[in-house]
């Protein structure tokens, strides 16, 4: 019996009648402990068990974007780990990257509770969290500590993707006081087996304390900061965090901060992007996350702005404020009709619109602007739909909450099957293949 069946799932199921945010915080607390205690005997053992069950490593899933290597295209969307407290553990759960935040320059409590609701009938969630987080300074301190513990291997050490089954000769690599087992390289000229070549089995990633996958940082505007001073607010956060993330996201599309979506206007957004690029001495990739509710002409304007300011890509999309596609009529926790509840909808109802936006961006830019697709991904079919529409990378959050930690591996297995069925040798061949 795996750790999810024996421990995590019973906790989740027994807590379904509690405030979803309370359950979220308890889960995040456990993951935070694992992230911070990977050097301990127990933490090291648990980390290895997670990797064995949830990770799938295959060269066909790897991509390099913006000079950053992504071991697979499936990442954790912003919103789950707002303060980066579990930044060191997401790779062990199978994710190819993780996006932290949304973080604001000033720490803030967010909107009053309750502010997170499950819409089970719709396989969706409604949230009006309001960028609750401890602030950019607190996140920087945490990531600095992880950076100290991070394994410094540049370029990444290459190891054969061999199934770790005894008997197996191994080399011993001393890693920050912990010994990790690495498969011995095959003799020069010896051909790998088909199973090794395809890399269908997992292998023990060289993981010590710290970060093992690319980390994105999602930046938002502090609620106390006037809209007229938004550019300085974003710039201040970026200045604190720029050396601690692999890419950065300008979030101007959350419906839960008053006036924030108005910053998607080209004039307003240009001020923010100009300020960030002036601060961007390290040439970090900067993306913008857009709302699914924008008109096509507004999206086209943003794409022109992306070209003007040298943006690295677009994240499509954030949550929607639409309610017309919902089966849920009333929120049980409040007794109010769902149409009267403020907040953004994520999950299955967002799937088609976010895919349409991805396809539009791909076609408008002729595939020259990388897209991270997010919204309504629950299955390998959902993931493939977004990839072939034009998304180089994809993200999950609500689907992961509903389907559990096995979902990441299952989706990656399904994507590999799609590649095989179509005779494709890498995920990059599939990107945009359905948007010609």
Regions found by a protein language model. Give the residues of each.
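N-terminal capping/small domains of soluble enzymes
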Residues: 1-151, 212
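Glycine/Thr-rich beta-alpha phosphate-binding loop at enzyme active sites
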Residues: 44-57, 252-265, 307-367
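Glycine-rich beta-to-alpha transition loops that act as phosphate-gripper elements at the mouths
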Residues: 78-81, 218-220, 290-296, 367-381
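Catalytic cores of alpha/beta
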Residues: 85-90, 294-306, 378-394
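Glycine-rich phosphate-binding active-site loops on the catalytic face of alpha/beta enzymes
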Residues: 99-105, 313-321, 384-410
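C-terminal helical cap(s) of enzyme catalytic domains, especially alpha/beta-barrels
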Residues: 110-123, 325-340, 401-424
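Alpha-helix-loop-beta-strand connector modules within alpha/beta enzyme cores
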Residues: 124-126, 134-137, 142-146, 150, ...
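Active-site glycine- and acidic-residue-rich loops that bind
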Residues: 222-234, 262, 288-307
């Amino acid at each position: 019996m795996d750790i999810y069946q024996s421990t995590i799932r019973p906790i989740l199921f027994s807590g379904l009648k509690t405030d979803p945010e309370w359950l979220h915080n308890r889960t995040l607390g456990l993951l935070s402990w694992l992230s911070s205690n990977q050097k301990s005997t127990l933490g090291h053992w648990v980390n290895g068990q997670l990797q064995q069950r949830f990770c799938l490593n295959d060269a066909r899933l790897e991509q390099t974007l913006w000079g950053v290597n992504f071991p697979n295209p499936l990442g954790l969307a912003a919103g789950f780990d707002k303060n980066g407290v579990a930044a060191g553990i997401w790779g062990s759960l199978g994710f190819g990257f993780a996006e932290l935040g949304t973080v604001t320059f000033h720490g803030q409590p967010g909107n009053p509770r309750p502010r997170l609701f499950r819409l089970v009938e719709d396989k969706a969630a409604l949230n009006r969290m309001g960028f609750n987080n401890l602030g950019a300074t607190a996140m920087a301190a945490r990531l600095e500590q992880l950076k100290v513990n991070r394994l410094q291997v540049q370029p990444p050490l290459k190891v054969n993707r061999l199934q770790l089954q005894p008997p197996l000769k191994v080399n011993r690599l001393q890693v920050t006081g912990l010994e990790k087992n690495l498969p011995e390289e095959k003799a020069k000229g010896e051909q790998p087996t088909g199973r090794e070549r395809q890399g269908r089995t997992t292998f023990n990633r060289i993981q010590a304390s710290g970060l093992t996958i690319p980390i994105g940082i999602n930046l938002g505007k502090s609620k106390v900061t006037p809209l007229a001073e938004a550019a300085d607010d974003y710039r201040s956060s970026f200045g604190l965090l720029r050396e601690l993330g692999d890419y950065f996201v300008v979030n101007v599309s959350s419906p839960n901060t008053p006036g924030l979506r108005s910053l998607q206007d080209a004039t307003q957004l240009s001020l923010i992007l100009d300020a960030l690029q002036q601060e961007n001495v390290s040439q970090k990739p900067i993306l913008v996350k857009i709302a699914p509710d924008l008109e096509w002409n507004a999206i086209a304007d943003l794409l022109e702005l992306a070209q003007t300011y040298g943006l690295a890509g677009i994240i499509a999309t954030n949550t929607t404020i639409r309610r017309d596609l919902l089966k849920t009529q009333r929120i049980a926790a409040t007794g109010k009709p769902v149409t009267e509840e403020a907040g953004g909808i994520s999950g299955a109802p967002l799937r088609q619109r976010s895919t349409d936006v991805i396809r539009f961006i791909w076609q408008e830019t002729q595939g020259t602007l990388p897209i991270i697709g997010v919204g309504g991904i629950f299955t390998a079919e959902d993931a493939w739909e977004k990839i072939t529409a034009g998304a180089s990378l994809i993200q999950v959050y609500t689907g992961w909450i509903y389907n559990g930690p096995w979902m990441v591996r299952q989706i990656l297995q399904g994507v590999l099957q799609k590649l095989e069925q179509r005779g494709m040798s890498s995920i990059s061949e599939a990107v945009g293949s359905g948007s010609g």
